[in-house]
Amino acid sequence: MRTKSFSLLALAAVFTLSACGGSQNSNSNSAASGAKTAGLDVNKTYIVATDASYAPMEYMENNAVVGFSHDILDAAAKSQNVKLEFVNTPFKGLFANVDKGDSDIGLASITINDERKQQLDFSDPYFEATQMIVTTDRNANIKTFADLKTRPASVQAATSGDLILQDLQGKDSQNIKRFETMPLAFKELESGGVDAVVGDSSVVAYYVKQNPNAKLNTVVDPSFVKEHYGFAFKKGRNDGLREAINKGLAQIKTDGTYDKIHTQWFGTPPGNSAAASSASQ
């Protein structure tokens, strides 16, 4: 069984979302006793659609969904007496799944952007990331994102990495190789089918650390903007679910639960200065 706790100091510096500190001795019962959100059905089990192929954020382990994003949503929900059931759902159809009402919440390390906000509503941000490039020694001349202008690169389809590569190479570029999951995109690089992978720093750094024999290298480009993850809801939904999750996020950031979960997964609390030092090496 893979352990949750690992040291990813460089990773934490690149994409940590600063959270409010607080006493870690607070228990969930104090949060659960708070005022009930108007319209929320506390007797209902809400369905969460998640693309569980995105370690360490959300992935399958022993036939169950685990990961940092899972733990954050689960803790936020429990603090408000909200019951959840997590269902593994391919990312490509996840937005439509939520939009049609087949699921109540979308959980897939979803970057909040203006285009997606036209289709879905989002929770408050719970994590900060950026894009990252992965190469091998045979492509050591790739130093910046601009170097991928005419180079074949793999991405997970419909992700932020896919979108920024389209901006660089053009939407119809034959050099963009799209895959259903990030592990498949990485395997394409390792087999020599592409020169690079572009993906979220959270997943990229974890994969590189977990696969040392692949001898992968990471490239951070200063042009990559910060991205914020949020939980997705059907546009215009007004049954109190999103409000409850936002209350829960605020609660776990205040009582120290967020910091505890972050440390379990990344080896350091958010905003740790030691992490920033390690990342610069």
Locations of the language-model features?
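Periplasmic-binding protein-like
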Residues: 52, 128-135, 201, 205, ...
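Ligand-binding cleft/hinge of the Venus flytrap
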Residues: 60, 73-81, 161-180, 208-213
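Acidic, polar ligand-binding/catalytic clefts
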Residues: 83-147, 222-223
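A ligand-binding cleft/hinge motif common to bilobed small-molecule-binding domains
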Residues: 108-118, 166-167, 190-191, 195-225
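Short loop->beta-strand "edge-of-pocket" segments that line small-molecule binding or catalytic clefts
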Residues: 46-50, 145-160
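Extracytoplasmic small-molecule ligand-binding "clamshell" domains
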Residues: 29-109, 255
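Extended ligand-binding regions for polar small-molecule ligands
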Residues: 21-23, 70-79, 159, 231-268
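C-terminal motif of bacterial Sec signal peptides marking the signal peptidase cleavage site
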Residues: 16-19
